[in-house]
C-alpha cells in the first residue's frame, strides 16, 4: 500500500468551489486560498439561522498507545461512508500543529484512503491561522514587557506625564503571559528575559507550544468576531504590585491582537479523498489544552449538513471530557451519538502485561485484560447520556478470531453496538456498516448532561473530575496550587470550568499505569487562569505545556525534490 502522501499526491482534487457548491455555500461566502482551500464567511450561519441543526457525532477513543488508534481516520472515513450511504455529512477537525508533524506523532489529516487532501497543505501552514495565533500571542508578550520597561525606567509619575497613560505598576515576578512557538522546543520551557542595561528588568518567562496558547482556545470557543474581541480583552497577562489582574484590555493591546486574528476566525474548507467537505479550524491539544476544533466550524456545518462528524483529542478522559464540559457548555450544541475507536493493538498495550511477543500476533490474555480499558471508556462516555458506538479500526495483521471475540465482548457492555472499520485501506466502502450504525444511533433518544454545574466551587469540580472522570480516590494540591485556588476564588473566577492538563497515556496522571487505575491521588501542581477562554487549567503531575523533540524526530524524513514535491511527510 502506498504512503499517505503518495495516496494524496496521486489523487486529483475537485475544485474547492465545487465542494462548497455541493455543500450549499454561496460564491460570496468563500475566500479562495489557492485551488484546494477556502476560508468560509461567518455569515453562512446567519443566512441559515432558521435551519434545524444537523445531528452531531463526536469521535473519541480508548487510552492512546504509540501505535495510533485512528480517530482522524475514523472521523474522515465515517464522513465519507455516510455520504456514500446517501446521508449528507461534513467533518470538522483541528488544524495540525507543526510540532508533532516534525516530532514523533506526524500529521493529522487522517491516513490511507480516509484522509483530507492535499495532506501536505493541511499539515504545513494551511491558511496561516496558527501563525496568526502565534503573532497575536507574542505581541501581548512584547507589549507587557515594553510597558514594564518604560514604567521601571521612568517611574510611575514620570511615565504618566510623558505617555498620558496610567501606570499599571506591573509586578515583574507575576507576569503570567508566556511566549509561544509552533515547534517542539524543550530548551525554551523556562527562560529569563530582559538581560542588558537597556532591555528591561530581568524576569522569568518561558515558551509554550502555540496549540497551548489561550488564544488558540479562544479561537476555538468564540461564537463570532465580537465574542473573539471581548474574550481577548479579558485575557489576564500579569498582576500588579497589589496582586490585582492586568488584562489585555487594560494594557491596550486587545484590539491589535484581534486585528491579527481577524481572518483566522473563519474556518477553512477542504475535501476528503471522496470529495466530501471537511472544515478545519483551530488546533488546541487535548492533553495541555481543551482539544477540540471550533464552535464556529460546528455551527456552520450544522446548518449545511444532516450529520456533522467531529473528533476530540486522545482518549475519552481527555478530549471528550473537555468537549462535553467546556465546548458543549459554551456552544449548547450537544452530540446525538459518540464513537469510541479501538484497535486490537491498543487493548493489548493497555493490558499492562509485559510481553516479548509481537503485539501484531494473537494474544488472548493481553486482549482480554486490556478489554477493561475499552469498557471503562464506554462507561465514561455513557455517563454523559450519549449513545456509544465502538469502531474497531482493523489492521492488516488482525485475526478474524480476535475481532469476533472483541465484537461479542462489546455486546455485553453499555455500547449501542460495534462495527469493524476498514476505512484506512478501503476508504468510504470500508466504513459503510459503521456509518449505518452510527446514523441509527443518532436517531435514538439522547439525554446529554454535564459532569458538573458551573456554580460549584473549583475545588468541587476538581474532585468530581478526579473521582468520576478518572477514578481517583482524592486530589492533592501543591502549596502553589492552593495559593492560586484562593486567589481565583477571591477574584470571582470560581465558577469557570476546569481544563485538566495531564498525560494522555493513562487515565491517571502517571503514563506508566495502564488499564484502569484506581485508588490513586490526583496531584494538582498548578492552576492557570484562562479568563478569556473561560476556564481554569489544572496542571497535573509532570505534564509540560511545551513538548520536546525525541531522539529520532520526524523532520529527519522530510525533504523536497527537484520538482518541488515534498517527500517523507507522515
Curated annotation (Swiss-Prot):
Pathway: One-carbon metabolism; tetrahydrofolate interconversion. Keywords: ATP-binding, Ligase, Nucleotide-binding, One-carbon metabolism. It comes from Shewanella pealeana (strain ATCC 700345 / ANG-SQ1). Its EC number is 6.3.4.3. GO terms for molecular function: ATP binding; formate-tetrahydrofolate ligase activity. ATP binds at residues 65-72. The lineage of its organism: Bacteria, Pseudomonadati, Pseudomonadota, Gammaproteobacteria, Alteromonadales. This is Formate--tetrahydrofolate ligase. It catalyses: (6S)-5,6,7,8-tetrahydrofolate + formate + ATP = (6R)-10-formyltetrahydrofolate + ADP + phosphate. The keyword Cytoplasm does not apply. It holds the Pfam family FTHFS.
